[in-house]
Amino acid sequence: MKNDSLKGQHRINEQIRAKEVRIVGDDVESAVYPIAQALKMAEDHEADLVEISPNAVPPVCRIIDYSKFLYQLKKRQKEQKAKQVKVNVKEIRFGPQTDDHDYNFKLKHAIGFLQDGDKVKAYVFFKGRSILFKEQGEVLLLRFANDLEEYAKVEQMPLLEGKRMTISLAPKKAGSPKKAETDTAKKENPKKAVETKE
């Protein structure tokens, strides 16, 4: 794994300018040492003296192989990035008098977006006097939300902003198929579902 992007961000060994440093870590006693002694300790450990907190007084260092240090840092950054879930918002535009063919086409796209984990913002755009059909636009968006009930939850009900009426939908967290099948069985035949469970 390449760590080139992280190199040069830390002073190591003779690059450290402080006269004394605080060393932390598992294999050494945490204390303040003169820089010459700290460098000797790093050499004895066949490792590097890495400055990890340059603004502290005195600067904080670790005795560790610099390549290993960069690897750990890169790994930690990658884990943090993985935790940050990026949510995309897909927009779907309707006219106030959208026909069924166009509606179903856009509904299919919305289902795909939601299944991919994206949010959907659907809106009706009113041109000129078509603003007179705003109630029709609201009905259309509510129908859209109702048809997507299996895949999405409503984050924002239809809201008119200028010439656009918008509704916001977020994907539902999918439950396990096994649980869904069990729930269906209970609804269809409660007694049989109980017997199966036993």
Curated annotation (Swiss-Prot):
Biased composition, class Basic and acidic residues, residue ranges:
178-198
Keyword Cytoplasm among UniProt keywords: yes
The protein's matches in Pfam families, at most eight in alphabetical order, are given as: IF3_C, IF3_N
Q: Where in the cell is it found?
A: Cytoplasm
Biological process (GO) annotations? ribosome disassembly
Transmembrane region(s): none
Q: Which UniProt keywords apply?
A: Cytoplasm, Initiation factor, Protein biosynthesis
Superkingdom as given in the UniProt entry: Bacteria
Location of the region described as Disordered in the Swiss-Prot/TrEMBL record: 168-198
Gene Ontology, cellular component aspect: cytosol; membrane
Please list the GO terms describing molecular function. Answer: ribosome binding; translation initiation factor activity
Q: Per its database record, what is this protein's job?
A: IF-3 binds to the 30S ribosomal subunit and shifts the equilibrium between 70S ribosomes and their 50S and 30S subunits in favor of the free subunits, thus enhancing the availability of 30S subunits on which protein synthesis initiation begins.
Which family would the database say this protein is a member of? Belongs to the IF-3 family.
What quaternary structure, including any partners, is listed in this protein's UniProt entry? Answer: Monomer.
UniProt name for this protein: Translation initiation factor IF-3
**Species annotation:** Phocaeicola vulgatus (strain ATCC 8482 / DSM 1447 / JCM 5826 / CCUG 4940 / NBRC 14291 / NCTC 11154)
Q: Give the source lineage, highest ranks first.
A: Bacteria, Pseudomonadati, Bacteroidota, Bacteroidia, Bacteroidales
Question: What gene, per UniProt, encodes this protein?
Answer: infC
